[in-house]
């Protein structure tokens, strides 16, 4: 929906603010993706907390409720030419019983960039929730069904893409599973 550059269309009842619902058929993939993002946000209270995040460890859990990152974990880049941004939502501040942490990575550059991921507790793994650069699944995997990152330390984010990762205690990357199996065989 274009507003032809008008940022104050909320107060206009004319073709500038009218929505053409017939465009939904033509843009059904985008419409489905946005519906999934809205549903995902509603199902995780970390993305709609009752109080604004404090960006500090006010519960003495070892991590802040929300932290900002750049291409390097824990090192945000706020200069005007930076085009990469990450945000870590600590699950321990969630009101949900699952206490799942999330990491969002925004690459606004026209080239792919590698992001360092915040470390998770032992036995937990980062799993992809959605990736706007992934066309095969319309960018969104059913919750808990996304690929587990093989490299839990860093991830390549595509050009002009947004990715969301969730902490998953149920799955481990293949390397970790092989290492555990190797230790059992050695015993």
Regions found by a protein language model. Name each.
Residues 1-187:
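Carbohydrate-interacting/catalytic domains
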């Amino acid at each position: 929906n274009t507003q032809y550059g008008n940022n104050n269309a909320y107060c206009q009842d004319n073709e500038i603010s009218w929505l053409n619902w017939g465009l939904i058929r033509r843009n059904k993939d985008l419409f489905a993706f946005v519906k999934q993002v809205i549903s995902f946000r509603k199902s995780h209270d970390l993305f709609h907390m009752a109080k604004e995040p404090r960006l500090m460890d006010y519960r003495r859990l070892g991590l802040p409720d929300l932290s900002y990152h750049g291409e390097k974990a824990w090192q945000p880049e706020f200069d005007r030419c930076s085009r990469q941004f990450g945000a870590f939502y600590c699950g321990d501040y969630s009101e949900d019983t699952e206490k799942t942490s999330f990491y969002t990575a925004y690459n606004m550059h026209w080239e792919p960039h590698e992001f360092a991921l915040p470390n998770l507790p032992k036995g937990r793994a980062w799993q992809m929730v959605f990736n706007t650069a992934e066309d095969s699944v319309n960018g969104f995997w059913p919750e808990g069904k996304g690929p587990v990152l093989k490299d839990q330390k860093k991830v390549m984010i595509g050009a002009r893409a947004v990715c969301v990762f969730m902490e998953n205690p149920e799955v481990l990357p293949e390397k970790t599973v092989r290492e555990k199996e190797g230790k059992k065989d050695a015993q």
